[in-house]
C-alpha cells in the first residue's frame, strides 16, 4: 500500500488503541512501514496482537506517553480532558479523529464503505471475502474479528479497500468512499444525533459523499431506508433485499443441515440485463444474514465479479467472531456468543437459533449495554425475547455511563413479564451466573449469550467453569 506520508514522519500515537476501530487503522499503518504507538486502559487480545506486530503500547493514559508522537489520533470514546489530548494541544502536536485518519487511507485506493445500524461487520467481511476470492487482494479495516484472518484488518496489495463506517458520531460523512452500502437505519446513537431527522440526514450526507462515478447499494427492505430513498436520486443506487421490488433479491430460501440455500435474481437497470444465480450455499443462519449476503452480492455484481466466484466465496465464508458464533458445546448444549445488543439484533439472533433445530429449547443470557440504550428502547427490549424459552438478565454494562433511575435489569425483567414472557430472571451478582446456568443447562439444547459488554468473557469461560462446578 502506497501512502503519501514520508516514512520518516515519526510516531502515529493512538489514544485508546485497543478499540476495534482504532486497532485496524494502527495495524494497516504498522504493516505499511510506519512507526505506531498507542495507549489503552488495559491489555487485551487486540493489544497483544498489536505488540506482536511491533506497535509500542502504553497501558494507561499519561501525558508522557506522547513525547515521541508526531500526530495523535483519537476516537469519539476519548474525552477532550484526556491527559494525552491535553498535552498534545500544549505541544502543538496535530490531533485528528480516527475518521480523518481512515479517510486519508481511503484516498489512496478505490474504497467500499459499509454503514448501517446492524450488519456492518458481517457485510464488510462478506464483501472482503468475495474480493479476496476473486484475487483482488483488498485492504480491510473491519469492526469485528474476521475468523479466517484472526484480525479485523488486512493490508492488501490490490486496488480496493473495504471498511466499516461508523455512523454513531456522524463521522462517516468524512470518508468519501467510491462505493457505499447502507444495511439499515434504526433509531440508535440518538445521544449524538438527537432525533430521527438528524440521523436520516447523516446517512444522506454519507451517500452524497460518493463521487459521480461511484454507486451506493441500499437494503430496500428497511422502512427508514425507503424513507430517505427519494433524497438519493442524484447518485447511482442499487437496491437489494427480500422485497420483490429489489434490484438484487433472494428467492427460494430454504434451510438444510444448518445452512441457508437461496437463489438471487438481478435486474441491471443500466443495460436491462436480468439473470439468476441458482443455489447459493451460505452457512450463516437467519434472514438478516441473507440480507447481509445480498449486500455483498450486489456490490460484486456491479464490479463484474462472476457468479461462480460469488457462490464460492459465500460457501467458504466462515463468519465473524461474536456474530452468532458457535464457540463450544457442553454435553448436549450448544454455546453461542452474539454481539446483539439492540432489540432488532436480539430478535434476529434468537430467530436464527430456531433454524438450528426447530424444536430446540433456547436459554438466552442478556447483558444490557448502556443505560441510555435500555431507556430509549425499553419497550422494544421488553418484546424482543419471544423466541427464547427462558431469559436470564445480567446487570447493565454501563460503558462509562451514569446510572439512570428505573432502568436496570430488574426493571427490564418486570417489563418483559408485562409483555407476556413469564420465564425471565434477573440476577443481583453477575458472578453467580455460572451456578445459575449449571442448574438450568440440562433443560436446553442452545444457550446464547447476547450483549456488547464483557458478557463474551462469560460465554468463553462457560464450559470450563461448569466442568469445575460439576466436580
Language model region names:
Residues 38, 140, 180, 218, ...:
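Structural beta-sheet core signal
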Residues 3-5, 28-34, 51, 64-67, ...:
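Phosphate-binding loop of NTP-binding sites
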Residues 31-32, 37-58, 147-151, 405:
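N-terminal beta-loop-helix "entrance" segment that forms/cooperates
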Residues 14, 114-116, 449:
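Hydrophobic Val/Ile/Leu positions in short beta-strands of Rossmann-like dinucleotide-binding domains
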Residues 8-25, 35-41, 320, 344, ...:
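Active-site beta-alpha connecting loops in nucleotide-dependent enzymes
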Residues 214, 389, 445:
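Glycine-centered, small-residue-biased loops immediately flanking beta-strands
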Residues 56-68, 432, 437:
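Short acidic low-complexity segments
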Residues 3, 9-11, 15, 50, ...:
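Adenine nucleotide phosphate-binding catalytic loops in nucleotide-utilizing enzymes
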